[in-house]
Amino acid sequence: MKRDSNRNLVRKRADDSDSDDYNTFAGLEKDSGPEEMSSLSFGAIRNAQKNLDKENEDDSDSDSDSGPEENSGGYERSSYKGNNKGKGNNKEDGGPKKRLKHAPSEASSKKRVSVIRPIPGLTMTKSGADSASRDSKLYRDIRFDATYGKANEDRVREDYAFLDEYRREEIAELQAKLKKTEESYIRSQIQTQIQSLQSKLKTLEKRDFRKKVLNEHRQQQREQAKDGKNPYYLKRSDQRKLVLTEQFKTMKKKDIDRAIERRRKKITGKEKKDMFSGRD
């Protein structure tokens, strides 16, 4: 106890000496000149400086506790951290209130608008959502959906047979336009369009001819079945031969020779390919 009392006494004397040095330094700073200031010891100057720094800190703490100051512009000045920390938490400070249940939804204006828009009547599938929707089709159209079965090609051909006449008219217009055009680039584009339309029209005509030949053969077999004879239904290879034979009957000799030569080259190329692949 005696030792603690001695320590407290020493601290009190040290504080008194510091305060005396500070008072002396402050009085000399106000009333004396530089000659009297130079007579002070370094210890007294240091202690006085510590007391001044402590007073400045106390003043700054009292200013911050008193509230935000108003600058010359008329708005409140506060720290950035304080504003962010209290944002949305203090309802008394005018922060954002809780959203109402039936309030309209808000969307960010920075979000990009999707290129793919919803189409009424079509269900949009999200890829990766489930195993059934993991395909390249984004929209499902019931007209071309495989789950509804295969399309009736014969019925489709009958319903849209009138388009052949439009294709022929378009080919005639493009051919007339080709005669008037002199630029090579535009001519090549027109020729490509003409070849595409002619190829499509030729494919449809071949399909119609094949269907006609096979229907006639089936009709003959039905009539023979009515007469008591056994019907004979052709295999696919026999169907191709029958269609090819009937096709040659309708062609000219020049076209037949050209078709035979083309077919001979095709078969020869296939045989050569099979021969070289067999060596490997």
UniProtKB/Swiss-Prot annotation:
Keyword rRNA processing among record annotations: yes
Compartment list: Nucleus, Nucleolus
Entry coiled-coil feature ranges: 165-208
InterPro entries, sorted: RRP36
Chief location: nucleus
Quaternary structure annotation from Swiss-Prot or TrEMBL: Associates with 90S and pre-40S pre-ribosomal particles.
Pfam families reported for this sequence: RRP36
Name of protein: rRNA biogenesis protein RRP36
Function of the molecule: Component of the 90S pre-ribosome involved in the maturation of rRNAs. Required for early cleavages of the pre-RNAs in the 40S ribosomal subunit maturation pathway.
Organism: Yarrowia lipolytica (strain CLIB 122 / E 150)
Keywords, comma-separated and alphabetical: Coiled coil, Nucleus, Ribonucleoprotein, Ribosome biogenesis, rRNA processing
Family: Belongs to the RRP36 family.
GO BP: maturation of SSU-rRNA from tricistronic rRNA transcript (SSU-rRNA, 5.8S rRNA, LSU-rRNA)
Gene this protein is translated from: RRP36
Compositional bias ranges of the Basic and acidic residues kind: 1-16, 268-280
GO cellular component: 90S preribosome; nucleolus; small-subunit processome
Region annotation (Disordered) ranges: 1-135, 214-238, 261-280
Bias (Acidic residues) ranges: 55-68
Cysteines engaged in disulfide bonds, as pairs: none
